[in-house]
């Protein structure tokens, strides 16, 4: 009944971003969209719908029905939240990702390399050129792999920078990674 549907709008608020696996596009998210249009009187339920690729274990989709679920907290305890976050940013969010401890260890090594670069600086958006590189990557469908490529390309050439450029790059790098949810305590 229409009154009940309209009541949903009081419980479920409009969202900027609604996320889910790409296996939920149809019928789940299409039904959710149709129901929410009634609840919100034809107003937009979510500005953006993001559909991520599946996480695979040994080439098989991780799922409850397959009985191959890995709990994120276990890996955060083993590798830290920063390393797990870095692992997920190294691949485009819409593409499937293989999940292995070897890849987590590789992510840990790579993240520790980044950590060495930013450990002794303050967070500051000083390098506007690198801010623009970050913004362009995010505007390109949240292209974190592209951005990480730019990060490590510049880290590899850090010795070519003068002292001020190096400092501004390091401060900006820390600033950007804080935006992405990383902590540097």
Residue ranges of predicted features:
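Catalytic cores of enzymes that engage adenine nucleotides and/or redox cofactors via long glycine-rich
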Residues: 13-78
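Catalytic adenosine-cofactor/nucleotide-binding cores of aminoacyl-tRNA synthetases and other
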Residues: 51-133, 140-143, 152, 156, ...
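Single conserved hydrophobic/aromatic residue that forms the stacking wall/gate
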Residues: 1-12
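Hydrophobic/aromatic-lined pockets within catalytic cores
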Residues: 10-13, 37-44, 88, 92-93, ...
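Short, mixed-charge aromatic SLiMs
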Residues: 27-31, 109-117, 171-184
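Basic, alpha-helical terminal appendages of large translation-related enzymes
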Residues: 149-185
């Amino acid at each position: 009944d229409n009154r009940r549907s309209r009541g949903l709008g009081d419980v479920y608020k409009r969202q900027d971003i609604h996320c889910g696996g790409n296996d939920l596009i149809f019928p789940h998210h299409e039904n959710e969209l149709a129901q929410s249009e009634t609840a919100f009187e034809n107003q937009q339920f979510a500005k953006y719908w993001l559909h991520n690729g599946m996480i695979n274990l040994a080439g098989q989709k991780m799922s409850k029905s397959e009985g191959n679920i890995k709990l994120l907290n276990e890996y955060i305890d083993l590798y830290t939240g920063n390393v797990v976050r870095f692992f997920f940013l190294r691949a485009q969010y819409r593409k499937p990702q293989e999940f292995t401890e070897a890849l987590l260890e590789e992510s840990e090594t790579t993240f520790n390399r980044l950590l060495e670069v930013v450990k002794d600086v303050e967070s500051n958006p000083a390098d506007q050129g690198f801010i623009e590189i970050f913004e362009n990557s995010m505007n390109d469908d949240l292209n974190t792999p592209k951005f990480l490529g730019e990060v490590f390309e510049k880290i590899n050439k850090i010795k070519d920078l003068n002292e001020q450029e190096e400092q501004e790059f390091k401060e900006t790098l820390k600033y950007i990674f804080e935006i992405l949810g990383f902590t540097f305590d």
